């Protein structure tokens, strides 16, 4: 975090505007650097189900290349014409992970060439990037008891995620065509920028009572995404010969920009300050998570997502109580917080068992 502040004092003692403060700051709000690996033995499921589920119901001629067409051209054309789901089915078909039930253009049912049994699976995820915020601040003091503040924020998102899924098996029987290894890479790059603002006021109603109010606007993001994929399969034919097939589209999917509006928040606070004794404070804030929205709304995926957000999420109220007691050179502080769950109980199944309400306290 880095920043600077310039303070302007009004030399005219009769002017009711006493002070103006202007500042700028940059804060890296989130570091997206993360890396982890998972290893497991799965006795039930193979990655073949991913390609089967995407292919089921799709015509064979919509997920296969034309005669003489390259993998790259077919992958790009299928994505532009039909979309991402068809591309996943195309990868599964071209890599021989799945086969059509019938080899004709009208076929829409598929089977797996991965024999059932036990699977050794490893998953690795590597993330890079950051979320940052550049803020321009202005503060004003009116008379001796009213303070105004304004923040204008520019947000930055840079996120790159690279995943590798590797699966091996020794299932199946000799003389059977089968897939005994799958290596699947996916890369997602997300870039975005956004804008938000905060407006606040603090007033001293007396030497004892202070009151504050803050409005945090929504953050309006414009987000761009790119994806790329790579797939390898190891095959064993009917003569038990092993061969490696590389299905590399060598292409980047660049998607249409979309926008995200996060919820706004209002906050109110009051404090009772007793000189040489301490203080008591109370803060209340409200944020409506159901107002979060993706656009364009004519996109069926975003329309369904917005509907789910508005149904499953709700207002969240947060209450904070604090106190500080002074006793000679000793200072005792304590606080308690209550925050509602963001989930709408009427739309959450009892089997989901979701309760994200928060209660906490601190002493010092």
Model feature map: region roles:
Residues 7-364:
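Outer-membrane beta-barrel porins/channels
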């Amino acid at each position: 975090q880095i920043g600077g502040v310039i303070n302007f004092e009004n030399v005219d003692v009769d002017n009711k505007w006493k002070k103006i403060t202007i500042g700028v700051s940059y804060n890296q709000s989130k570091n997206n650097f993360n890396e982890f690996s998972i290893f497991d033995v799965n006795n039930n499921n193979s990655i073949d189900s991913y390609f089967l589920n995407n292919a089921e119901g799709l015509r064979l001629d919509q997920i296969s290349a034309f005669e003489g067409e390259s993998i790259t051209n077919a992958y790009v054309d299928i994505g532009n014409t039909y979309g991402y789901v068809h591309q996943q089915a195309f990868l599964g078909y071209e890599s021989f992970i799945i086969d059509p039930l019938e080899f004709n253009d009208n076929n829409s049912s598929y089977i797996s060439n991965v024999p059932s049994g036990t699977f050794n699976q490893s998953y690795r995820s590597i993330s890079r990037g950051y979320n940052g915020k550049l803020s321009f601040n202005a503060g004003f003091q009116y008379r001796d008891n009213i303070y105004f503040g304004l923040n204008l924020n520019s947000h930055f998102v840079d996120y790159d995620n690279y995943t590798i899924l590797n699966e091996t098996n020794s299932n199946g029987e000799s003389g059977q065509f089968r897939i005994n290894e799958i290596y699947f890479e996916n890369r997602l790059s997300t870039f975005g920028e956004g804008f938000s603002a905060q407006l606040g006021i603090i007033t001293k109603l007396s030497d004892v009572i202070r009151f504050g109010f803050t409005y945090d606007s929504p953050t309006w993001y414009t987000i761009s995404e790119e994806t790329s994929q790579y797939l390898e399969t190891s095959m064993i034919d009917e003569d038990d010969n092993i061969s490696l097939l590389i299905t590399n589209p060598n292409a980047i999917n660049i998607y249409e920009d979309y926008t995200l509006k996060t919820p706004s928040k209002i906050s109110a606070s009051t404090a009772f300050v007793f000189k040489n004794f301490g203080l008591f404070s109370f803060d209340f804030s409200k944020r409506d998570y159901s107002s979060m929205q993706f656009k364009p709304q004519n996109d069926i995926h975003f329309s369904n997502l917005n509907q789910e957000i508005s149904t499953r999420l709700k207002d969240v109220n947060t209450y904070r109580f604090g106190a500080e007691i002074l006793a000679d050179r000793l200072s005792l502080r304590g606080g308690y917080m209550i925050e509602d769950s963001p989930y709408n109980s009427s739309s959450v199944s009892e089997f989901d068992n979701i309760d994200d309400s928060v209660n906490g306290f601190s002493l010092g």
